[in-house]
Amino acid sequence: MHPGGAIGGELIFSRLGDIVTRWPWVVIGCWTLLALMLPMTVPSLTELTQRHPVVILPVDAPSSVAAKKISQAFHEVDSENVLIVLLTDDKGLGPADETVYRTLVDRLRNDTKDVVVLQDFLSTPPLHELLVSKDGKAWILPIVLAGELGTSASYQAYAGVAGIVKQTLESTAGSSLKANLTGPASTVADLTDAGARDRTSIELVIAVLLLTILMIIYRNPITMLLPLITIGASLMTAQAVVSGVSVLAGLAVSNQMIVLLSAMIAGAGTDYAVFLISRYHDYIRMGSGSAQDAGCAVRQALISLGKVIAASAATVGITFLGMSFTKIRVFSTVGPALAIGIAVAFLAAVTLMPALLVLAGTRGWVAPRRDRAGAFWRRTGVRIVRRPVAYLSASMVILIVLALCASLVRFNYDDRKQIPASDESSVGYAALESHFPVGQAIPEYLLIQSPHDLRTPRALADMAELAQRVSQIPGIALVRGVTRPTGKPLEETSATYQAGMVGKQLGSASHLIGESTGDLNRLASGAGLLADKLGDVRIQVGQAVAGISGLLDNLAFAQKMFGDSKTLGEIDTAGKLVSSMRALGNMFGINFSTTMNDINWVGAVVIALDSSVLCDTNPICADARAQFHKLLTASEDGTLDNIAHLWKQLGSTQSSQTIGATVSGLEKTLTAVNTSLRSLGLDNPNVMRSKMIGLQNGVNDLASAGRRIADGVAVLVDQTRTMGTSLARASAFLMEMGQDASQPSMAGFNVPPQLLNTEDFKKLVQAFISPDGHSVRYFIQTDLNPFSSAAMDQVNTILNVATGAQPNTTLSDASIYLSGYTVTLRDTRDYYDRDLQLIVIVTMIVVLLILMALLRSIVAPIYLVGSVIVSYLSALGLCVLVFQVLLRQQLHWSVPGLAFVVLVAVGADYNMLLASRLRDESSHGLRASVIRTVRSTGGVITAAGLIFAASMFGLLLSSIATVVQAGFVLGSGILLDTFIVRTITVPAVAALLRRASWWPARPWGNNA
């Protein structure tokens, strides 16, 4: 030992060696009690895998937050424990199949213990298009199961639903319907079964491999069994401690973690045991102890290697503990468990293993065999020292070529590929993809949350624009929602569709006007004729009023002067009066009869004008229609008939009539007229005169109005014809716009307010809008593989496009969320990238600092850590060649991070053993120290490497792809580190650097 040895560490292990060698049975008894009694006080790890399952992402992950928001807004269960029942009929789904479907839905709804939510298209018709395949041969029945995903409650619920599905299909006749179970719940159930099924076989194979390798190395059954006893006690104790931590602190447990814990304890524990046995044999050979005094050799070996084993365990354990600060729960839960396992393995290596060596050594059961490999390793050391550049170059070429292959790595985030293709969930996924696009079965959910009610036309229009923009992203197949329930915008809500409908209506109006051209011409002609006749009436009434006024004056005077008994003929001066009365009556009787006949057709005109919307909007036409109504009223109430009778009486006046009789007859007629036209004042001569004047004025106004009517009707007809032409042009334009601008990018969006109250809209609301109206979700289906990196990149694009559509809209203050399995994978990738950086930094710092503390040097730890990194990259490159290039399997995303921690930590073990021995042998000269170190550690490191690699290769028997890949990369990495890096590369570098390796400390001895 050199003077600069770790005095404190040696003192600790010296005292520990004294205790172990003095009371070995006590130490063994304590470990036996721990290994047997401790597991009885805590649940098994298998049980805890269901009580405390591993959740990959933290609760504040964006995808987790989005899922929580959706479940709260729509009052749904926030659970990833989803089972998909796929019902298929290769002959096509028929009525008999639908009967089975209804029966199954009813039975599942009655199973309230296992089923939390059931989504069927019977109770939710808007989901029909999502749940039925386009080929008409498959139905999807999504079910949310009771319990959290991965728990025993979830597993029991899965088994219960699977039983109902199987029983329903078997008990229903007349249907060829088949069922497959898939989805996250089915995948986790298969993983659980596979983990439980694989664990026993893996542990058995590891034990057999260890026995075989130990038998080859030691050729002694007792020596071979000692490490296995130590590993067994360590494993039982470590599992119990991890279980206790899980119960007390809620540490999540998975089957993969249990397998890795077993492998790590087996590998590390065996390494520590091999290191200790090897050094024990060295001291036995050097005569430091005999078979009768094995305790001394054990104590010396423990003092010599205790600090190395402690540094190695600290390196691995602290590195694993550093993983607890990662975000991904796979790392943050596996790390502490593996750290506990390493700590227990270390304690067993420095207490139980020495105690067993003391008992076996004193009986001569573990005496060293003749060192047959020593000469080989010495020759290897000599060659390396003589030609360090050549050996270093050759080893680096191999390592660098393999490391370059690591740049080709492509990660797989599809957990479906972890399990065998023959498992239930894998078969179900394959059947699902044959009938449905993968994106339809695994959609994404875009959530819009606003402080305002989104059930308004403007908000719906803004959301339609947002959804339209998202749908135009390359790789997006469909976007379904309240504004586009079929994946395309509703035709009725597009502005161009509505314009087209208006165009059709205008076209109909134009056509109607065109067909009514003859009626319009007759209307114009009739209005002109009416105006002409009313002009004639005005002239005649003017003459009549003048004549009647004079006549009334003369008759009144004659009656006064001659009395009522005189005849008109007896009055000579009245001759002219009689002639005038006859002429006046005849003239007006004939002309008024003609006018009456001409007025008869006005009724038809009025009926036509009353039904005309255009006349309602035209003031001229409306005024003319009112005048026509007055004429019809006068005709219908007898006013015009009484006037005609007046003319007839005047025309039949005889000279033999007495004045009284004549006046009396005229008065009777006028009284009748007065009854109808009391407003004319014909009930007395004075008023009659004024009324006749008023009549004359009224007729004048009527004639003038008639002319205005005729002129107005002519203008109206011309305007109507012009309007018909304009309507035709407008109709053609709008209909052309409705056809040519029907694409979503040109169609616009308009929601009539009355649409919001329709039954169809209310059904859409239930599926896409939250009850309070403040949250709206859209279903997004992608053309990409939802498990691919391209789909994960698309998630960011969707969010960027959606948020980019918010400014200057009613959604400006809304929050946008995206949920779904692809979003979860995106978060997993993002967290993994950050966690991997953390793991690399923490691991490098921990390994470097511990090596510096152990070797009291800066240079040697730097190239030792560099060699570990190269070894890791080479192992990863070899894994890429085997799985990705040869087997066409992408590496699971969790493998590189876990492999880095294990390989760097294990490589540090061998580095510490090698470097510490170099340091110890430096008193013999640097060149000689390299040769002596290679000779003394070559066999030990090789044996330890083979044992650890065998433990890792035992994982290849797993049916879980991730475990297989991890086992291969770890096993191959350890072999590369054992046979190339520790055997050739590091000794060659040490030989080249010589004294500089220990800078700034000074080596002991000469530079021989």
UniProtKB/Swiss-Prot annotation:
The keyword Transport applies. It comes from Mycobacterium leprae (strain TN). InterPro entries: MMPL_dom (IPR004869), MmpL_fam (IPR004707), Mycobact_MmpL (IPR050545). The keyword Membrane applies. PANTHER family: MEMBRANE PROTEIN MJ1562-RELATED, MEMBRANE PROTEIN YDGH-RELATED. This is Probable transport protein MmpL10. Its main location: membrane. Keywords: Cell membrane, Membrane, Transmembrane, Transmembrane helix, Transport. The gene is mmpL10.
